[in-house]
Amino acid sequence: MNIAKMIDHTLLKPNATKSEIEKLCNEAKEYGFASVCINPCFVDLAYSMLKDTDVKVCTVIGFPLGANTIESKVFEAVDAVKRGATEVDMVLNVSMLKSGDYDYVKKEIEEVVKAVKSYGDIVVKVILETCYLTDEEKVKACQLTREAGADFVKTSTGFGPGGATVEDVKLMRQTVGENFGVKASGCVRTAEDAKAMIEAGANRIGASAGVKIAEEWNKLKMS
């Protein structure tokens, strides 16, 4: 197993600098990560550094609260794609989900999916922010995400009170089935953490510790 190809090398902190993003992109090229996951203002920079590689540019939409309007999420997603992003991680509207307004939740995902996929094979991941949800809400969010035409469910923003757990990843995988993406993010800091998430059903890992995870994995010759 090539662990690097399962990692979205991530830097989303609000005080990230251009030089830190450049370092992130260089590390992604060196290690062969699946993507870099960055804030929207850095998409141009990342694209300029990675356009001749197989490392994807991933950005976040409605981040980190997910409370933006549908229209603003669509605009933000399309703008990112026009600038070179080929993967977008959108935060689900947790308030609407917990209010039981499932039509709204499904519609917002559908609208973003429809808008970005008109530009090509853009991967859409939906961040559930599982730390705020009951198990029943996690299942419903997974079902809505799949029905709406997205490509992945993702556990967390990394900005909430909790991150990915083995139990949540198992539940998400069980709900979406085999032919769908599950991304574990938040609190995945070591190769052992990554291995546990993959064994639970994740096929993508979001982590700011991508280099550490990859080096530990290779050193331990994990499979």
Curated annotation (Swiss-Prot):
Catalytic reaction equation(s): 2-deoxy-D-ribose 5-phosphate = D-glyceraldehyde 3-phosphate + acetaldehyde
Subcellular compartments: Cytoplasm
Enzyme category, top tier: lyase
Keywords, alphabetical: Cytoplasm, Lyase, Schiff base
Domain of life: Bacteria
Keyword Cytoplasm part of the UniProt annotation: yes
Record-level GO BP terms: 2-deoxyribose 1-phosphate catabolic process; carbohydrate catabolic process; deoxyribonucleotide catabolic process
Zinc-finger as UniProt keyword: no
Main location (coarse class): cytoplasm
NCBIfam families on file: deoC (TIGR00126)
Family stated for the protein in its record: Belongs to the DeoC/FbaB aldolase family. DeoC type 1 subfamily.
Summary of the function given for this chain in its UniProt record: Catalyzes a reversible aldol reaction between acetaldehyde and D-glyceraldehyde 3-phosphate to generate 2-deoxy-D-ribose 5-phosphate.
Record protein name field: Deoxyribose-phosphate aldolase
Organism, as annotated: Thermoanaerobacter pseudethanolicus (strain ATCC 33223 / 39E) (Clostridium thermohydrosulfuricum)
